[in-house]
Amino acid sequence: INWKKIAEIGKQVLSAL
């Protein structure tokens, strides 16, 4: 599991809300 990618995607998802 690539936690850095998950963190980046998570930030993008939160900013998209």
From Swiss-Prot:
Q: In which tissues is it expressed?
A: Expressed by the venom gland. This peptide is also found on female cuticle and nest paper. The venom could be the source of these peptides, which could be spread all over the cuticle by the frequent grooming movements of the female wasps.
Offer a single GO CC term for the protein: extracellular region
Main location as per UniProt: secreted
Tell me which residues bear Leucine amide. Answer: 17
A biological process term (GO) from this entry: innate immune response
The superkingdom listed in its UniProt entry is: Eukaryota
Compartments where located: Secreted
Keywords of this protein's UniProt record, alphabetized? Answer: Amidation, Antibiotic, Antimicrobial, Immunity, Innate immunity, Secreted
| Physiological role | Shows antimicrobial activity against the Gram-positive bacteria B.subtilis ATCC 6633 (MIC=2 ug/ml), and the Gram-negative bacteria E.coli JM109 (MIC=8 ug/ml).
Protein family according to the UniProt entry = Belongs to the MCD family. Mastoparan subfamily.
Q: What is this protein called?
A: Dominulin-B
Q: Which organism is it from?
A: Polistes dominula
Q: What is the lineage of its organism?
A: Eukaryota, Metazoa, Ecdysozoa, Arthropoda, Hexapoda
